[in-house]
């Protein structure tokens, strides 16, 4: 980084810019005299909007350009929605800070119906997520699920134009964009288990950049980091990309870590669920052991079908 200037690589969507501004304000508050600049970029994920993410490389499309900017020195850090962060990082880069988590639940958004269960048969629900799709299809196989891409504003416009009867979005994104009023009802984890890391903001940087890592340290929220560590360890063992039907949600209750997870067939015909409880310091192992349980109870076959025969070992 330059003397007293830190540069954040960010996508240009309203939500990405909110996250970058949030980190900028936190850093400048923690370190008077530090100037934080945004380096807005367009990623492939922002350009390819006419195809479901699962068919064009998953959500890693949203981070590759940001990582290149850090590797070639145009930026010092990148700010990500944790649910978009792939399992593996390019050599020399890593996730060093996880900020405090916002509400991780999914949101049911509709101008006509109060809840998913109230929708009549044949209603159209919009989502681009296989995870959401499989859980909705399992609960309401009589609904029609259609792909929905674009930023939050674009998705809401499609709902308002009548293209869909309801759409599913993340509560956290709507809250951050001050669109809380659009949330018809949050979906309990029992109905729609969130994505790995959903609601959390993560910061990636060059691992050898000691000064930047020191500046970022005060932004780390340990409880969130522990919860996300368990969720990501499970996802890593499942070899889950960001566009596979995997849900995972960890909570800390009375000093104990409670991790729930599922792997589902995209059409909702089969869902394998499991849970584990343990000590927070064992978060990573908890995630791995739960993944092993899921794999042994049918998740391996489901994922092999999703990956067209190339599932986890």
UniProtKB/Swiss-Prot annotation:
Modified positions (S-(dipyrrolylmethanemethyl)cysteine) are: 242
Q: Name one Pfam family in it.
A: Porphobil_deam
Q: Which InterPro entries match?
A: HemC, Porphobilin_deaminase_cofac_BS, Porphobilin_deaminase_N, Porphobilinogen_deaminase_C, Porphobilinogen_deaminase_C_sf
Q: In which pathway does it act?
A: Porphyrin-containing compound metabolism; protoporphyrin-IX biosynthesis; coproporphyrinogen-III from 5-aminolevulinate: step 2/4
Top-level taxon of origin: Bacteria
Q: Which UniProt keywords apply?
A: Porphyrin biosynthesis, Transferase
Give me any GO biological process, just one. Answer: protoporphyrinogen IX biosynthetic process
- Record note on cofactor: Binds 1 dipyrromethane group covalently.
Q: Could you give the subunit structure recorded for this chain?
A: Monomer.
* Protein's job: Tetrapolymerization of the monopyrrole PBG into the hydroxymethylbilane pre-uroporphyrinogen in several discrete steps.
Q: Which family does it belong to?
A: Belongs to the HMBS family.
What's the protein called, per UniProt?
Answer: Porphobilinogen deaminase
Q: What is the lineage of its organism?
A: Bacteria, Pseudomonadati, Pseudomonadota, Gammaproteobacteria, Enterobacterales
